């Protein structure tokens, strides 16, 4: 398939610049298995979750990964941390008039120092330190001084509210530079109501990198090279899904990152069945993919020609997906990270 097959017209006014007043006040477009669509509100998801289903959430925590500083020569720099390597080192994008060389010293947020150790492709390996507080780790320095890394299509400066709202209520493991946005719609009350219905909640971890916003640049999507991200699927999550299957329940992935975790872990196992996994994945899910774990997907609305709309098409079917997106535009759903959600049921064989 061609990249252009996944293009659609999106009025700029539909790109959400702020979150809804309350997490659950978003709208929900349901793609039903019979091919129809239903316009709902997010709390209506309760009526689509059955007893014995399990919802799999990504518990990554967004770090305030955007940092501003200057070179010793006075030139301005902007860092977007891609990955925390250890207690001192990070991999980061650096924006400046001239790329800093190995050994270059930077002063960050007028608070601590950074030294460029080397380069790995488009990324820089950088060591962070604070002379007056040498015990502080790189992550602690980032947490104390960084800015929330809002996506490029949110055209405003980050605000105090974003530290809470660009984060899921169940976030636990720091490391993402972008939120797993399907989870932003849940508050603790809704999670309790889902459990009260007899559905279970499980967790995986995928630290979303800035590569999630990288556009597909090749025409033939089979030639696209997917970015790599760190994931973890724990034994207790594998066991939960096994029990769900035994009870006749469905696996509902909350977000494309949860899909990529589960399908990667199954793909990497010897027999193609879900197994615990910790490592990296560059799985690229496109139409024609045979899903091994996920039955239903909850996701936000994605960018035209993005790898994420391709993933949705793989589960929902290409024509159904593009029709649903056209419906969402017509009905003025809000798009992207702070926008509305869609619940995707794959089509039945006769729909």
Swiss-Prot record:
One of its GO terms (cellular component) is cytoplasm. It comes from the Bacteria. Its EC number is 2.4.99.17. GO terms for molecular function: S-adenosylmethionine:tRNA ribosyltransferase-isomerase activity. Transmembrane segments: none annotated. It is found in: Cytoplasm. It is an enzyme of class 2 (transferase). GO terms for biological process: queuosine biosynthetic process; tRNA wobble guanine modification. Keywords: Cytoplasm, Queuosine biosynthesis, S-adenosyl-L-methionine, Transferase. It catalyses: 7-aminomethyl-7-carbaguanosine(34) in tRNA + S-adenosyl-L-methionine = epoxyqueuosine(34) in tRNA + adenine + L-methionine + 2 H(+). Its main location: cytoplasm. Pathway: tRNA modification; tRNA-queuosine biosynthesis. HAMAP family: QueA (MF_00113). Transfers and isomerizes the ribose moiety from AdoMet to the 7-aminomethyl group of 7-deazaguanine (preQ1-tRNA) to give epoxyqueuosine (oQ-tRNA). Belongs to the QueA family. NCBIfam families: PRK00147.1, queA. Monomer. This is S-adenosylmethionine:tRNA ribosyltransferase-isomerase. It comes from Hydrogenovibrio crunogenus (strain DSM 25203 / XCL-2) (Thiomicrospira crunogena). The lineage of its organism: Bacteria, Pseudomonadati, Pseudomonadota, Gammaproteobacteria, Thiotrichales. The gene is queA.
């Amino acid at each position: 398939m061609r990249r252009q097959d996944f293009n659609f017209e999106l009025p700029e006014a539909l790109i959400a610049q702020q979150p809804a007043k309350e997490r659950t006040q978003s709208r929900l477009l349901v793609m039903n298995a019979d091919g129809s669509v239903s316009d709902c509100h997010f709390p209506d998801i309760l009526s689509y979750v059955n007893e014995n289903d399990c919802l799999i959430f990504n518990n990554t925590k967004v770090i305030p990964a955007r940092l501003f500083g200057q070179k010793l020569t006075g030139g301005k720099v902007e860092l977007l941390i891609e990955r925390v390597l250890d207690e001192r080192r990070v991999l980061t994008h650096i924006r400046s008039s001239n790329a800093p060389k190995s050994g270059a010293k930077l002063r960050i947020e007028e608070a601590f120092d950074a030294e460029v150790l080397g380069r790995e492709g488009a990324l820089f390996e950088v060591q962070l330190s604070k002379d007056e507080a040498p015990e502080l780790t790189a992550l602690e320095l980032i947490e104390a001084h960084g800015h929330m890394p809002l996506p490029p299509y949110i055209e405003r400066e980050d605000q105090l509210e974003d530290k809470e709202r660009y984060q899921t209520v169940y976030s636990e493991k720091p490391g993402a530079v972008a939120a797993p946005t399907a989870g932003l719609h849940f508050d603790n009350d809704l999670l309790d109501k889902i459990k009260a219905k007899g559905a279970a909640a499980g967790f995986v971890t995928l630290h979303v990198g800035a590569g999630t916003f990288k556009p597909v640049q090749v025409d033939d999507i089979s030639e696209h090279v997917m970015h790599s991200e760190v994931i973890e699927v724990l034994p207790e999550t594998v066991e939960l899904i096994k029990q769900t299957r035994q009870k006749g329940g469905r696996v509902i992935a909350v977000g494309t990152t949860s899909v990529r975790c589960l399908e990667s872990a199954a793909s990497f196992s010897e027999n193609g069945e879900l197994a615990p996994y910790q490592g990296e994945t560059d799985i690229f899910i496109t139409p024609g993919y045979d899903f091994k774990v996920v039955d239903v997907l909850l996701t936000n609305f994605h960018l035209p020609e993005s790898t994420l709309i391709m993933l949705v098409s793989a589960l929902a079917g290409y024509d159904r997906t593009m029709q649903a997106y056209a419906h969402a535009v017509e009905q003025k759903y809000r798009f992207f990270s702070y926008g509305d959600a869609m619940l995707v049921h794959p089509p039945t064989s006769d729909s």
